[in-house]
Amino acid sequence: MRPDQWRVADFTYCWTLAGFCYTAFCVDVYSRRILGWRVMSSKTTPLVISVLEQALFTRRRTAFRFTATGLIHHSDAGSQYTSLAFTEALRDSGIAGSIGSVGDALDNALMESAIGLYKTELIDRHTTFSGRAELERETASWVHWYNTQRLHSAIGYRPPVEYEHLYHQQTISAEVA
């Protein structure tokens, strides 16, 4: 397995004093790195498309040789992920879509786990968020910490960014040898 082979995506709701907001994520399965995320006040297709676009941008700005061709994007069967606009966005990016079975949370277990960590480590620790802007600021801070400092047992107790860096170092060393 390698980075940019398989991604998972989903979103969750978060209560604020201004009403519900929805936070969506896109995670690289290999490294557990959150590549894209977004907070919006509605759970429409633009929410998940913007996360897909952010994940692509994250890779394109840091990986000279990045291509989305052959990448698999897995999500649940929610209407946002099965919409024509989203499937066209996947196709236009060269990404293969994968949809889980209806009502099976285990089908997207890695994403459910990441959302569980988000809820436990950020949302549940906050008494209340004033609105979308505060939730967005706090989420940005949490995502940075999650990607650069949080240790993950599944990847050798390393943060996702470090784990990806090790992969790329090993790949370069193998190419030189």
Positions of the model-derived regions?
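Charged DNA-binding/catalytic regions of mobile-element recombinases
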Residues: 1-177
